Amino acid sequence: MRNQNIDQCWQFQHGLYDEFPDAEKAKSIREVNLPHDYMIESNVSESAASGPASGYYTQGVAYYTKLIDIPQEWEQEAVYLHFDGIMMNATVDINGCKAILQHNGYIPFSVNITPYLYFGKKNRVTITVAPSMQPNSRWYSGAGIFRSIELLHMPKLHIASDGIF
């Protein structure tokens, strides 16, 4: 198995995504590096759903997008994304196709993205973070991608990383 860290240069947008181009929303897209907690950047309000447990921070939906090159040579391999932590209710889309929905924000997870890839081309990875069920912790949990993301490629026949105990 070979892995590549892809924590750098993600496009970040806080707020609901609109299908139609909007010049004002385009201004709100900015580049971030991981780990990234967007909750700490949000407004403080006494009416925040988590109240004092979150320090009165509000959350909302956010999107992280990145184009990744997948070499043609990987076509006969399995390609995975491994996430060390996303808080929470994360949907991972590859080229517009939902690859996984991960509810728990504290558990690392991996997803096989091979079926969704265009080999020898750039591929769009979009991660939607929607920590809408509040309160979700007894302490400040943050919101966003708070750990690293690794791009893994390996032979199609392999032992799963969590397959031996």
Where are these predicted regions, by residue range?
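Accessory beta-strand-rich segments of carbohydrate-active enzymes
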Residues: 2-4, 11-17, 37, 54-162
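Predominantly extracellular/luminal regions of secreted and cell-surface proteins
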Residues: 10-41
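Helix-terminus loop motifs that line ligand-binding clefts
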Residues: 42-44, 57
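Surface-exposed, low-complexity/disordered Ser/Thr/Gly/Pro/Asn-rich loops and linkers
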Residues: 47-55
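Short, solvent-exposed loop/edge segments of extracellular or virion-exposed proteins
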Residues: 48-49, 162-165
